[in-house]
From Swiss-Prot:
Annotated transmembrane regions: 22-42, 57-77
Purpose of the protein: Seems to be required for the assembly of the photosystem I complex.
Keyword DNA damage in annotation: no
UniProt-recorded name of the protein: Photosystem I assembly protein Ycf4
Membrane topology qualifier: Multi-pass membrane protein
Organism of this sequence: Daucus carota
Origin: domain of life: Eukaryota
Compartments in which it is found: Plastid, Chloroplast thylakoid membrane
InterPro entries from the UniProt entry: PSI_Ycf4_assembly
S-S bonds: none
Chief localization: plastid
């Protein structure tokens, strides 16, 4: 859902707050919590989970391994929850023809460079470029070629877009910025 007028185009960017990331974080948390509870049950010799008796799983070696997997899964799950709450990769692209500026903003990890803010003059934009790699893992990425800066990606590399969608995005952006389109 982008906001567009005659002179300004603001395009929001979805970061790590995607449904798939949320589903993986929930599944990983519940699975690793289950592993940790089973490992702890085998250590204590009591049923913390009533699905099966704790006597069926020996603490050494199965209980230790399950506890280790549970702890490792909780660490990975907490990493996912942190990236979701910080919205890493989220932000916006603002194209302003009136001021002649392009502003790209992204949220990063907490610290010194939490806010990533790039500014360019529209006159420095050489072209809008589409890079297509076909095959089993097809990839279509939209870039903006900046004079002296190189190519800056505007779409996520893991975003699975159809050729028609990427062409339409590139055509709209090139028309708005009044620059040519290149395909690689």
């Amino acid at each position: 859902m982008s906001c567009r007028s005659e002179h300004i185009w603001i395009q929001p960017i979805t970061g790590s707050r995607k449904t798939s990331n949320l589903c993986w974080a929930i599944i990983l948390f519940l699975g690793s919590l289950g592993f940790l509870l089973v490992g702890t049950s085998s250590y204590l010799g009591r049923n913390l989970i009533s699905l099966f008796p704790s006597q069926q799983i020996l603490f050494f070696p199965q209980g230790i391994v399950m506890s280790f997997y549970g702890i490792a899964g909780l660490f990975i799950s907490s990493y996912l929850w942190c990236t979701i709450s910080w919205n890493v990769g989220g932000g916006y692209d603002r194209f302003d023809r009136k001021e002649g500026m392009v502003c790209l903003f992204r949220w990063g990890f907490p610290g010194k460079n939490r806010r990533i803010f790039l500014r360019f003059l529209i006159k420095d934009i050489q072209s809008v470029r589409i890079e297509v790699k076909e095959g089993i893992y097809a990839r279509r990425v939209l870039y903006m070629d900046i004079r002296g800066q190189g190519a800056i990606p505007l779409t996520r590399t893991d975003e699975n877009v159809t050729p028609r969608e990427i062409e339409q995005k590139a055509a709209e952006l090139a028309y708005f910025l009044r620059v040519p389109i290149e395909v690689f």
